[in-house]
Amino acid sequence: ASLVFGFGRFALHERRETNCMELTEPQIQRYSRQILLGEVGGKGQMKLRQAKVLLIGAGGLGSPAGLYLAAAGVGTIGLVDGDVVDLSNLQRQILHSTATVGMPKVESGKKTLTAINPEITVNTYHQLVDTDNILPLLKDYDVVLDGSDNFSTRFLVNDACFFAKKTLISASMFRFEGQLTTIKP
């Protein structure tokens, strides 16, 4: 579309077609490749902007997930992790860098995510998930993405999402194999 009549005219057309006057010109430019997709469009981009995703774990799985959520324009991302960045994390936990070694992973993650997209909100929770805090953590989010690295946390998050009626996306990795499942209430 942009080759035929220019991106500026496309953006104006997209704005009119989807009634998404809430998107600014810079936002339309930032998300233009998503807006071009019929499955997303301007309305879908507005939904992403209003979405709230809680990311449990800012390590090997949470790192790429967080990067893509921020780049896609998810409006609010919550990061939950009680760990700090270690040098041994850096080859697989791409949310972090040498400069953030020793920093809480949630703070390192926030720094990276807001550098990618300064328009999003990143809430940080430097804590481990437990029976006392899981339900309060979930309450303000639409979707929970579990990238934790142990079964007890996974079971707890699954149970909490069930009782709180939250959509759960659960991912795990072992060596070169991965699994992903989505559970809707």
Where are these regions (language model features)?
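Adenine nucleotide-associated cytosolic modules
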Residues: 2, 6-7, 20-185
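Short hydrophobic alpha-helical segments enriched in small aliphatic residues
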Residues: 11-14
